[in-house]
Amino acid sequence: MVDKLTHLKQLEAESIHIIREVAAEFDNPVMLYSIGKDSAVMLHLARKAFFPGKLPFPVMHVDTQWKFQEMYSFRDKMVEEMGLELITHVNPEGVAQGINPFTHGSSKHTDIMKTQGLKQALDKHGFDAAFGGARRDEEKSRAKERVYSFRDSKHRWDPKNQRPELWNVYNGKVNKGESIRVFPLSNWTELDIWQYIYLEGIPIVPLYFAAEREVIEKNGTLIMIDDERILEHLSEEEKARIVKKKVRFRTLGCYPLTGAVESEAETLTDIIQEMLLTRTSERQGRVIDHDGAGSMEDKKRQGYF
């Protein structure tokens, strides 16, 4: 008698299969590591896929220099504990221009420090495949993206020119200069991610758990006061509105562009219970998703994750 796989075990098996396929098919793959919960699950699956050996590819963090301080600490801790080969890349042109989310806005900051930074890093190291932790339930443009997302020589995505994917058969053929972005977590939901983290004991950034934190409400979004730089861009009236609230983050990005949510969820079981009851998108707090200068699909067409 064959035991039936649970829902999460089926997702796990599918993701591990995808990761192994890419490692076998491509010459120089890399795993993008954004330090968030999805990256944590994807990294855990990759380590399972090749256990007891080490990962046959490096992990890479495209650093905007505006992540939460706890994210940087967590990244360095994981790299040391897991013995990972970490590549970090910061767009030197963006640094020279002093690009930041306050002065230049979310759209320009994201394009230069994230999109252009990623393209620079992929070109510099000659990677022909890059794993990402995006899921189809996150956002509508991601919902129609294939597991193997093909990019042209300029890293652009054409949603009208995607290859069919039948069952678990993936076509990895690319021409010179082309590459793919691979999304092993495509069929996972936010609830799946949290349940898997709970069952597997996967470490995550403490920012996901509710705690008293200093925040300021800007345009309906609770922005955390993570370091002194944000204070330079607040008026005296805004500084007077800084308060402490019990909040957590459902998604993590650049801290001035990532909103917190009020919550009492201090444990993984609390978070799972919250997920069962919530009716709002996890990306409601991501400022770039509401940027009038361009939709997520437009950003992906230009080479975004």
From Swiss-Prot:
Assembly mode: Heterodimer composed of CysD, the smaller subunit, and CysN.
Catalytic activity line of the entry: sulfate + ATP + H(+) = adenosine 5'-phosphosulfate + diphosphate
Protein name per the record: Sulfate adenylyltransferase subunit 2
Alphabetical keyword list: ATP-binding, Nucleotide-binding, Nucleotidyltransferase, Transferase
Purpose of the protein: With CysN forms the ATP sulfurylase (ATPS) that catalyzes the adenylation of sulfate producing adenosine 5'-phosphosulfate (APS) and diphosphate, the first enzymatic step in sulfur assimilation pathway. APS synthesis involves the formation of a high-energy phosphoric-sulfuric acid anhydride bond driven by GTP hydrolysis by CysN coupled to ATP hydrolysis by CysD.
InterPro entries: PAPS_reduct_dom (IPR002500), Rossmann-like_a/b/a_fold (IPR014729), SO4_adenylTrfase_ssu (IPR011784), Sulfate_adenylyltrnsfr_sub2 (IPR050128)
Alphabetical list of HAMAP family matching this protein: Sulf_adenylyltr_sub2
NCBIfam families: CysD, PRK05253.1, PRK12563.1
An individual GO BP term: sulfate assimilation
Family to which this protein belongs: Belongs to the PAPS reductase family. CysD subfamily.
Enzyme Commission identifier(s): 2.7.7.4
Pathway: Sulfur metabolism; hydrogen sulfide biosynthesis; sulfite from sulfate: step 1/3
Pfam families: PAPS_reduct
Origin species: Pseudomonas putida (strain ATCC 47054 / DSM 6125 / CFBP 8728 / NCIMB 11950 / KT2440)
Lineage summary: Bacteria, Pseudomonadati, Pseudomonadota, Gammaproteobacteria, Pseudomonadales
GO molecular function, one term: ATP binding
